[in-house]
Amino acid sequence: MNFGLSLIFLVLVLKGVLCEVKLVESGGGLVQPGGSLKLSCAASGFTFSSYTMSWVRQTPEKRLEWVAYISNGGGSTYYPDTVKGRFTISRDNAKNNLYLQMSSLKSEDTAMYYCAR
């Protein structure tokens, strides 16, 4: 009886490990005001094309701000007024990648940027 319960628990744990969601951001750096930067996010562990995705940022004051949203197929995007016209979110579902093109950067754009599912 105990062996059976242990086996079920082990299978569930292993299944969870195999399905670990990973989002790995890259492309950050130091840029002068007015400059541009493109961020990338490599996704794994889930069916990327089935999910809407977003970029969020944490300011030096530790405030969390939503930056951009894109629908699962990429046809719809939304931005707050603070970045509208300067930031562009896009995705490549074949490569499981999310992107954020940032231009006309301002000092208030200084933050840690994260992709989110």
Curated annotation (Swiss-Prot):
Query: What SMART domains would the database entry show?
Result: IGv
Q: List the disulfide bonds.
A: 41-115
Region annotated Framework-2 sits at 55-68
Example of a GO biological process term:
immunoglobulin mediated immune response
Q: Where is this region: Complementarity-determining-2?
A: 69-85
Tell me a GO cellular component: immunoglobulin complex
Q: Which UniProt keywords apply?
A: Adaptive immunity, Disulfide bond, Immunity, Immunoglobulin, Signal
**Cleaved signal peptide residues:** 1-19
On whether Endoplasmic reticulum is a keyword of this UniProt record, the answer is: no
Which portions of the sequence form the region Framework-3?
A: 86-117
Taxonomically, the superkingdom here is Eukaryota
Question: Framework-1: where is this region?
Answer: 20-49
Comment field (misc) = This sequence belongs to the VH7183 subfamily.
Task: State the protein's name.
Answer: Ig heavy chain V region 5-84
